[in-house]
């Protein structure tokens, strides 16, 4: 019987691809919000490929790193393009992953627990990779960003100082630090690639969620051609936006201080990370205690893990809970405002604003399940 089947269904390797991309049973009603998974895969591919070409010319040495990046931009064929695509590609990666997580929170896809937990691990890995990548050009913001962020580990009782010196490979951010950051920046995307495959493996065990939050087993359609073409439109839009930014204003999202070679003797006026970390940075700064700030920083991402545990509703998805919907969009606004606060100097109106926003950010995760219980009582009169 098998000899009458197409090769994609019988070949050991093609069978895996077929089950993931061609004959995968998909809910017929998934919207544009389900496109971001494939867009993230595209971003990862772009980053790995551009990174591979950059690494051929980059030199991980504090004397040469800044000038090797300069050399790439000035003398390597299309080096400026590869570098700016890589830098802006990271921004698009984070835009896509934040929208992907937002979709997961809104439609409560976190009930696919293993998929969600692996996703949170991928987010941590991505943040670590992006942070280490930011250090590599060895400009002022690279150096001071590395110094400030790694220094946060010194807040850990007993082990802190020893841990920081161990990561630095000395008593300050130096050549050893740059070399190891470069090593891990090269290695982590491949670990992210492996985790993505595990993420998909768990997702395909259960099947995707859908905008109604209902069991869609009775109404599935094959992934190809329906969603391959739908994803292709997303690819075209993403590539268009990425190239528009890269070719018209490539350094818009960067920091002007990073055009100055790293100087340990001169501190920039305002040390800040890239825009995609600013909300977490604002949360870190709003706690007046060092250890407390570090815990708040980690918890701002790690809190996503508690979402499946606080699911106490009778219906899946916020689309049936108007008050929760309203709260969700307030929460989105909080994250945007925290991003803005993170870029502002530490002075009068911004400090208290950041602290209030931090309280409201964490309050969402407490109030959301409580309000959903209240709404269930109204709906079901129990």
Swiss-Prot record:
Its main location: mitochondrion. The chain crosses the membrane at residues 36-56, 80-101, 116-136, 181-201, 229-249, 291-311, 323-343, 350-370. It holds the Pfam family Cytochrom_B_C. It is a multi-pass membrane protein. It is found in: Mitochondrion inner membrane. Heme 1 (or BL or b562) is low-potential and absorbs at about 562 nm, and heme 2 (or BH or b566) is high-potential and absorbs at about 566 nm. This is Cytochrome b. The gene is MT-CYB.
